[in-house]
Regions:
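Glycine-rich phosphate/adenosyl-contacting loop at the front of the ribokinase-like
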Residues: 2-87, 325-329
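A generic structural signal for short hydrophobic patches within well-formed alpha-helices
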Residues: 122, 131, 149, 180, ...
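Conserved phosphate/ATP/ADP-binding segment of small-molecule kinases
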Residues: 169, 179-250
Length: 329
């Protein structure tokens, strides 16, 4: 197995990952019914960074979520849900003047459509001052995504400060490109490349890399040439495979075969699984496998956060040979 060559320094009491970003209340028809046909809506929460924090907690990695919520019933629901998943939410601040963001899902066989109501939300008012939080200063890893800089000018400044301003002693950083075209007036090609180049660990889908930076990025190795600076770059190729580049070395692990219920949240789950492997000193191959099996748990449910396999099954999946892995459903 190929080692990852680099990983964040671990203090005596172990790693702590702090995930920074917006989480909204999510409304969706139950059982995948189209919005126009449903008689009711189920309420859940949705946020890329809090998804990562919750899955890290599932993997017994200490995690914190840092954000802002409105002083409203939706904000209290979000806080309760994430806290109940085992995530430290003590750094979340309440804004009495701004609401908690909201999204509505409309299931469709061609792909779930999502409508966002987040303009002027409490989280959109976050800025670089968030980085002074003790929850961040005492963490060993910060995780952000490309969603945050799309929310507002101050959130863009937050992302730039977190990833690009690197004074001595700053925690390691993880960045999921997570390009959402609907959040941008035009593709933020240079901004997201700048943020990715500045991070220690980067996640990007091959398809989103092509959408952002051109069809010339045909393979994972092309993306590595375009993003040479991250210590670890993970390129995901959907249902095919994921490749981790660690310095000049690389390792590829095929995706698990999954009967997909809904793809939303799978990328966050993969990132959390891989980071859990990294922080637990697993090899590149085992970290990728942990990413895949965590993503599979999200793909099998309608929400963003699904249950992991039992610990014994996880160990079996990490230990089986590549043929057995490829045959697993």
């Amino acid at each position: 197995m190929t080692d990852l060559l680099w990983r964040p320094a671990a203090p005596a009491d172990g790693h702590v990952a702090a995930c920074v970003g917006e989480t909204m209340v999510a409304l969706a028809p139950p059982d995948g019914i189209a919005l126009r046909q449903t008689a009711g809506l189920a309420l859940d929460v949705a946020g890329a960074e809090s998804n990562v924090a919750m899955y890290l907690a599932d993997h017994e990695v200490r995690s914190r979520w840092v954000s802002r919520l409105g002083d409203d019933v939706f904000g209290r629901r979000v806080l309760h849900r994430i806290s109940a998943a085992g995530v430290d939410v003590t750094a979340v601040r309440t804004d009495p003047d701004r609401p908690t963001g909201l999204l509505v899902k409309d299931p469709d066989p061609a792909g779930t459509r999502v409508s966002y109501y987040r303009r002027g939300s409490a989280a959109s008012a976050m800025g670089p001052d968030v980085l002074s939080s003790p929850a961040l200063r005492t963490a060993t890893l910060w995780h952000l995504t490309g969603i945050t800089p799309a929310l507002s000018d101050s959130c863009r400044e937050l992302a730039m400060a977190a990833l690009c301003d690197r004074p001595a002693g700053r925690p390691a950083t993880s960045f999921d490109v997570n390009y959402r075209p609907s959040l941008w007036r035009e593709p933020p090609r240079e901004l997201l490349r700048t943020l990715a180049q500045a991070a220690d660990v980067v996640f990007v889908g091959l398809d989103e890399a092509q959408s952002l930076w051109g069809d010339g990025l045909r393979e994972a190795t092309d993306v590595r040439e375009y993003l040479p600076d991250p210590r670890i770059l993970v390129v995901k190729d959907g249902a095919t495979a994921a490749t981790a580049f660690c310095g000049d070395a690389s390792v590829t692990v095929p995706s698990l075969k999954v009967d997909v219920v809904e793809p939303v949240g799978a990328g966050d789950a993969f990132a959390a699984g891989f980071l859990a492997g990294l922080l637990k000193d697993q090899s590149a191959e085992r970290s990728l496998r942990t990413g895949h099996l965590t993503a599979a748990s999200a793909l099998r449910v309608t929400g963003d956060h699904g249950p992991l396999p039992e610990p014994g099954e996880r160990r079996r999946l990490l230990d089986i040979d590549i043929r057995g892995w490829c045959e697993t459903r």
